[in-house]
């Protein structure tokens, strides 16, 4: 008797294939028929991605110009560290007023960050960065020559507006000007630029303090410290006049021809049209609403994000950054040595931020946050004990550097990475 089981299995397989083909065939025909009527942005989803042929040096130049905003962010926030003790003597500030003069910039930062999003959509990324450059320059001049403390506070808050806006808009501009395969590395330059600004201003403050004795610094030195920011602010303003607007913003405004000119240079002519179609499709799919974050599925993520952001700011980093010279003067250092310690502290901050960028993907976000949080707690405890036991400034310096290194490799940069990753794409903005 013949074994017909192989033939039966083959017949069954043919019926299955036939059934699948009957299901696919009408859909495929409709796609082909629709192809002629597809928009450019719809075709982009199915077409192969053309090769990248952009000018990398030009992209890097645009990135460096934008990240000057980050450098000014770091410069403007950290300049107070070298000046505040001289201002205490100049204006006879109480401890409460010293804290207010040091921290009032944060009011401007908050307002600037809130306003920057809507304003950058309305005016454009480049135009808003131009405004921040002007604010940085005006703030630098105003804080250098105030007639009284009220004027100083006003111009300091004005600088805070620029800091908050630059913190948001500069990385957005870089993200929108850079091709996808370079975007992550180029956006990470913003964090490096911020800390580089802190290093630069620490060196500038130290150099200015060397130009005279203590009395000269009380009357004039701190003014030059604030006024020195005018130079990088004017450089930022000049360079922004040479860069184009973000192609994404241009496309959103219907100025596709202008966007094409930019993309021809940043992505290459072969890829520019595909980039425009892809951006148009992405803009059309941006349907996320802020109230979605309050839904049960997102609520836990939102709470975690808020707690992480708060913890990042209340772990003592701002006290260390703003009062580094004060900390070392309190431990027995001279004015000049306290400012020299500040340079070392910011250099450690920059070095370990670079380490964090190198290891965050290999070691993972959670282990880095947990381990460095423990290290920060231990370092702060030892720092407090050093003052209690009246240890030398060398021990104080060691514990401060340990704290900064722990923050710079963990809580500082990694929190921003986590916040960028935990939200679904549709609600991320």
Locate the predicted segments by residue:
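Leucine-biased recognition of intrinsically disordered, low-complexity hydrophobic segments
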Residues: 7-10, 29
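Catalytic cores and adjacent flexible loops of soluble metabolic enzymes
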Residues: 13
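Tryptophan (W) side chains
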Residues: 21, 25-28
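Alpha-helical transmembrane bundle of multi-pass membrane proteins
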Residues: 32, 39-264, 281-429
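Short helix/loop segments within enzyme catalytic domains
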Residues: 266-268
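Short, well-structured alpha-helical segments
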Residues: 272-281
């Amino acid at each position: 008797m013949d074994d017909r089981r192989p033939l039966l299995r083959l017949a069954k397989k043919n019926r299955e294939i036939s059934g699948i083909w009957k299901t696919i065939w009408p859909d495929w025909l409709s796609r082909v028929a629709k192809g002629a009527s597809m928009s450019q942005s719809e075709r982009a989803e199915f077409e192969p991605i053309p090769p990248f042929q952009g000018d990398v040096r030009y992209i890097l130049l645009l990135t460096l110009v934008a990240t000057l905003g980050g450098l000014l962010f770091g410069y403007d926030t950290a300049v107070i560290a070298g000046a505040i003790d001289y201002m205490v003597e100049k204006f006879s500030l109480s401890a409460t007023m010293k804290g207010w003069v040091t921290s009032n910039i944060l009011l401007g930062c908050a307002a600037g960050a809130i306003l920057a999003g809507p304003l950058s959509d309305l005016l454009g990324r480049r135009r808003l960065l131009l405004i921040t450059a002007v604010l940085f320059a005006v703030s630098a001049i105003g804080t250098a020559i105030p007639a009284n403390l009220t004027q100083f506070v006003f111009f300091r808050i004005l600088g805070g507006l620029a800091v908050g806006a630059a913190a948001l808009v500069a990385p957005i501009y870089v993200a929108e000007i850079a091709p996808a395969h370079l975007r992550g590395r180029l956006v990470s330059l913003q964090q490096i630029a911020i800390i580089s600004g802190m290093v630069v201003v620490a060196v500038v403050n130290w150099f200015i303090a060397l130009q005279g004795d203590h009395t000269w610094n009380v009357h004039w030195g701190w003014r030059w410290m604030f006024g020195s920011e005018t130079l990088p602010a004017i450089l930022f303003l000049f360079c922004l006049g040479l860069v184009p607007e973000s192609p994404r913003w241009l496309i959103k405004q219907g100025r596709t021809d202008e966007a094409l000119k930019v993309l021809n240079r940043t992505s290459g002519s072969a890829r520019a049209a595909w980039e425009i179609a892809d951006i148009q499709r992405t803009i059309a799919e941006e349907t996320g609403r802020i109230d979605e974050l309050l839904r049960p599925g997102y609520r836990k993520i939102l709470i975690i994000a808020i707690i992480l952001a708060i913890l990042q700011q209340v772990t003592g980093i701002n006290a260390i950054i703003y009062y580094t010279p004060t900390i070392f003067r309190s431990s027995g250092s001279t004015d000049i040595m306290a400012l020299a310690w500040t340079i070392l502290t910011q250099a450690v901050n920059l070095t370990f931020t670079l380490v964090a960028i190198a290891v965050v993907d290999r070691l993972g976000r959670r282990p880095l946050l947990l381990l460095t949080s423990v290290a920060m707690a231990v370092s702060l405890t030892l720092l407090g004990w050093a003052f209690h036991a009246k240890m030398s400034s060398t021990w104080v310096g060691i514990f401060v550097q340990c704290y900064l290194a722990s923050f710079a490799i963990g809580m500082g940069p990694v929190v921003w990475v986590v916040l960028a990753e935990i939200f679904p794409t549709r609600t991320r903005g």
